[in-house]
Structure formats: structure tokens, C-alpha cells
């Protein structure tokens, strides 16, 4: 009887020893480990594919340099932004083509304060034309429509000025009408104003600036801000002290 019990116990122990081991304790290189490695690799591959697809659908944010370059490119602007425009200046023009150098021409279309196309280019400045018969300016000036990419705002900070905007599927450029001295001379003695008595006064011509409301880039959004542009050439006179 005891021999039978010993035989059964030995057979039971042999059976336990010969049973397959669990996957938690499988040594490296075993088939179970290979299956786990293959599964892990497959999951990693799927994760990489998903990451690539996500990057394609949601590209990484652009660098500051790229944003600055893009800010002067063709940007789609919400028409409602022009409804919020105040303090409109005749020196700021949105045009689909270069404005004429002569202010007498009326062929350029631009966006006005009412979000409509307007052909009245600087009409107010034509009310007092300058005649060439015996009339001369104290300082010679030159005016032209220019494109600005950067400017100084009213707070003294450099800002990025929008050049091209896309409104209603049409591209407009932002122009600024600037006036400056024709031949600015840093030496006041050599840039006397015309018609000023040099025996009593020291005089010189200088370019003055003012602020106009322009469309600029602030981060990733377009916004209206006051920027500084050249607007006139004026004469500065200083009384000579020797006469007192």
C-alpha cells in the first residue's frame, strides 16, 4: 500500500515538473518571448504610423522667423475686420494694382471705410493744387506710394506690417502715401529753406512724421495699429542770437 502511495506521489511530481511554464517566467529566446517581442514591435510600428498621420494632419507650429515671413505674404483676412477700422487715413490704400504716381488719375480701386470699392484717390488733397507759375515751396518734397514691411508703432515698438491680404478671393496690397524732403541734408547750414532771410534766421528742411492706422500682424492674427510714416517736409527756423 505504501509503495503505491510513493509511486503516485512521484508520478504527480514528475507531471508538475514537466508542465509548460507560464509566460511570466519564460526565458529570453523562447517562443513565448518571440511572440511578445513581435507584438510589441507591431504596436510600436502602429504608434509611429499614427504619429506620422497626426503630424500630417496637425503640422508643428512654425518658428518665429517663419511666422514673420508669412505675415507679409498673402493672408486671408476676415471682411469683418474692416468694419472695425476707425480713423481712416487717405494715406493708407488697399489696392489690387500699383497706385498712380499722379494724384489726378482715378483708376485705382481700394477698400474704403464702408468695405466697398472706391475710386476717389486723395480727392481732398486736390482742392488746393500747387501751381508752378511764380509759386515755390519753402522746402522741396517728394511723394510716392510705398510698401512697408516693418514700422514703428505709437508705443515705439517695431511691428510687422501686412503687405498682401486676401479679401473675398482677391489679393490686395497695402500702400502708404509718404512725403519726405527731396534732398535731405543732415547739415542745417547747407539746407536752408527757400525765401528765408539768412541774416536773421537759421533755417533747414526736415521730414516730419505722423501716425496712421494700418493693418499689422500681432502673433498669428491681423490687427489695426497706429504706425509712423513720413508725411511732410517742413522748414525749421531759428533766430540768430547775434542780432540781440
Curated annotation (Swiss-Prot):
Pfam family, one: NGF
Subcellular location: Secreted
GO biological process, one term: nerve growth factor signaling pathway
This protein's UniProt keywords: Cleavage on pair of basic residues, Disulfide bond, Growth factor, Lipid-binding, Metalloenzyme inhibitor, Metalloprotease inhibitor, Protease inhibitor, Secreted, Signal, Toxin
GO cellular component annotations of the record: axon; dendrite; extracellular space; synaptic vesicle
Phosphoprotein is among the record's keywords: no
Biased composition range(s): Basic and acidic residues: 47-66
Residue ranges annotated as propeptide in the record: 19-125
Expression sites by tissue: Expressed by the venom gland.
Keyword Hydrolase listed: no
Taxonomy, superkingdom: Eukaryota
Predominant place of localization: secreted
GO molecular function: growth factor activity; lipid binding; metalloendopeptidase inhibitor activity; nerve growth factor receptor binding; toxin activity
PROSITE patterns xref list: NGF_1 (PS00248), NGF_2 (PS50270)
Region of interest called Disordered, as start-end residue ranges on this chain: 47-67
InterPro entries xrefs: Cystine-knot_cytokine, Nerve_growth_factor-like, Nerve_growth_factor-rel, Nerve_growth_factor_bsu, Nerve_growth_factor_CS, Venom_nerve_growth_factor
SUPFAM superfamilies the record matches: Cystine-knot cytokines
Disulphide bonds in the chain: 139-205, 181-233, 193-235
Complex formation: Homodimer; non-covalently linked.
Protein family membership: Belongs to the NGF-beta family.
Protein's name in the database: Venom nerve growth factor 3
Record organism: Notechis scutatus scutatus (Mainland tiger snake)
Source taxonomy: Eukaryota, Metazoa, Chordata, Craniata, Vertebrata
Amino acid at each position: 500500500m505504501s509503495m503505491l502511495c510513493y509511486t503516485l506521489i512521484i508520478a504527480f511530481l514528475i507531471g508538475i515538473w514537466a508542465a509548460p511554464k507560464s509566460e511570466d517566467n519564460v526565458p529570453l529566446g523562447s517562443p513565448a518571448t518571440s511572440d511578445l517581442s513581435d507584438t510589441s514591435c507591431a504596436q510600436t510600428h502602429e504608434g509611429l504610423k499614427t504619429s506620422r498621420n497626426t503630424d500630417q494632419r496637425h503640422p508643428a507650429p512654425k518658428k518665429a522667423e517663419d511666422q514673420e515671413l508669412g505675415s507679409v505674404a498673402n493672408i486671408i483676412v476676415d471682411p469683418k475686420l474692416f468694419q472695425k477700422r476707425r480713423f481712416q487715413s487717405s494715406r493708407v490704400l488697399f489696392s489690387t494694382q500699383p497706385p498712380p504716381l499722379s494724384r489726378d488719375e482715378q483708376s485705382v480701386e481700394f477698400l474704403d471705410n464702408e468695405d466697398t470699392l472706391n475710386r476717389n484717390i486723395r480727392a481732398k488733397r486736390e482742392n488746393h493744387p500747387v501751381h508752378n507759375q511764380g509759386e515755390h515751396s519753402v522746402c522741396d518734397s517728394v511723394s510716392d506710394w510705398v510698401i512697408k514691411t516693418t514700422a514703428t508703432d505709437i508705443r515705439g515698438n517695431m511691428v510687422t506690417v501686412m503687405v498682401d491680404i486676401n479679401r473675398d478671393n482677391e489679393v490686395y496690397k497695402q500702400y502708404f502715401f509718404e512725403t519726405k524732403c527731396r534732398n535731405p541734408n543732415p547739415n542745417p547750414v547747407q539746407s536752408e529753406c527757400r525765401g528765408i532771410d539768412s541774416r536773421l534766421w537759421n533755417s533747414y528742411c526736415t521730414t516730419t512724421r505722423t501716425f496712421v492706422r494700418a493693418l499689422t500682424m500681432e502673433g498669428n492674427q491681423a490687427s489695426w495699429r497706429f504706425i509712423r510714416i513720413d508725411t511732410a517736409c517742413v522748414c525749421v527756423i531759428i533766430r540768430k542770437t547775434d542780432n540781440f
